[in-house]
Structure formats: structure tokens, C-alpha cells
A protein has these predicted regions:
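General small-molecule cofactor/ligand-binding pocket signal
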Residues: 98-100, 201
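Conserved SAM/SAH-binding loop
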Residues: 102-106, 135-136
């Protein structure tokens, strides 16, 4: 039996594959985390967007359809990346999306992905040799344009990802949208980003995602 295909705004087509989670919104004809995406669409256009923890492509597809000239879709889980690439193909967005099958960390290396729940995105990065680990700074080599937005939802490794982003933050000053689940993570992100001239501005969603913007030259 073939997978169900659903249309989303922007001419995007997606296939529905269990488990549903964010795809419940797709079945209603809308994107997951729509308020966050609407804010990004209103305030940030052009350049390269980096979708760290792209999962099955919800944010990548929106960015490619509405906001960015290029999207780097960074996702370490093979099954998720395959679903993402199918959605990109169906939507005709191959020329705008650059897939990167890797986890994000403070340093390049190797690791493994441990499935820690039932949903597509519930994988944790652990020691191993099954998947590449890259840094946000290393991704600069793939960027065709200055980086406008970085979104990070990488299951407890957001702080490590920020530690590997010094050159990117200094060069392009992108807006950052980071999922930070604990007060400790929030404080750690503030400590990294404040010396780089960033201010935490807005909070979105029940799994809190925070916007950070560069506040000085």
C-alpha cells in the first residue's frame, strides 16, 4: 500500500509515515510549529538557513518554500533523512535543499544515534562509530550564501552544537532558534551567546524554542 501524500502551503507535498507526531499537523494541511515558522517567515528572508535536527523535513520544507535561497538539512538518522529527501523530491525543492547526514557537536568526529523514544526525533547522540559528527563551523564550506537563520533541535546536544559555531556566529551573525529544555541549558546558551553579542528575545512552544538575535555590531 502506497504512503498517503498531503499538500501543505507553498506547493509542498509530503508523505505520511508512522509514527505521526508532527505529521498530525500535516494531515490538517498545516506545518508543525506553525507560530514559530510564521515568525521566521515574517522577519527573515534570503541567504542560507541551517536546519539542525531536520528530522523528516517540516522546517526544511517551509524554509525552502517561503524563506531561504538555500537550506542545509542536517539530520543523522538514516530513516528520517530518507523521509525528508522523499518530501523534498515530491515538492520539487532539490535545488534549494542540501542534505547533510550527520549529527552536530562541538568537534567533528563519529558517534551513534540511540533511539530514546517512539517519535522520529527522539534519538540521542552517544559514543560510537555509526554516524558522522560535524560542527556548524564546518558547514560553512557548504553554504552558498551568508547564513541568515540557524534552527537547532538536536536532542540535548544544542549546547555542544553552539560550542562548534564560533566562526559562523562571528562571520554571519545569524538569528538562532534553539530548543532548550532545562534552565541549565538555557543558562549555558546565554553564557555562550552573550559574549558574541546575542540577546535572547522570544520563546515559542511547549518544548521551548528560544530566539536569539545579534544585538550589537
Amino acid at each position: 500500500m502506497s504512503a498517503q501524500t498531503v499538500s501543505l502551503p507553498g506547493g509542498v507535498l509530503v508523505t505520511i509515515q508512522p509514527p505521526l507526531h508532527q505529521q498530525k499537523q500535516w494531515l490538517k494541511g498545516r506545518y508543525y510549529e506553525a507560530p514559530l515558522l510564521a515568525h521566521i517567515r515574517k522577519h527573515y528572508r534570503g541567504g542560507t538557513f541551517i536546519d539542525g535536527g531536520a528530522c523528516i523535513g517540516n522546517h526544511t520544507l517551509f524554509f525552502a518554500a517561503f524563506c531561504a535561497q538555500q537550506v542545509l538539512a542536517v539530520e543523522p538518522v538514516e530513516r528520517n533523512m530518507a523521509h525528508l529527501l522523499e518530501n523534498v523530491r515530491l515538492s520539487g525543492l532539490q535545488d534549494k535543499v542540501t542534505p547533510v547526514r550527520a549529527a552536530l557537536g562541538a568537534l567533528p568526529g563519529r558517534g551513534a544515534m540511540l533511539h530514546a523514544g517512539r517519535m522520529h526525533g527522539e534519538y540521542n547522540l552517544v559514543a560510537g562509530d555509526a554516524v558522522d559528527v560535524t560542527t556548524l563551523d564546518a558547514l560553512l564550506a557548504l553554504c552558498l550564501y551568508p547564513v541568515t537563520v540557524v534552527k537547532l533541535d538536536v536532542q540535548w546536544t544544542e549546547i555542544a552544537a553552539l560550542q562548534g559555531a564560533a566562526a559562523l556566529l562571528k562571520r554571519d551573525h545569524p538569528a538562532l532558534f534553539i530548543e532548550l529544555m532545562t534552565l541549565g541549558e538555557l543558562a549555558a546558551a546565554d553564557d555562550i551567546l552573550r559574549p558574541c553579542g546575542y540577546t535572547r528575545t522570544l520563546k515559542f512552544g511547549g518544548s521551548p524554542t528560544y530566539e536569539y538575535v545579534r544585538s550589537n555590531g
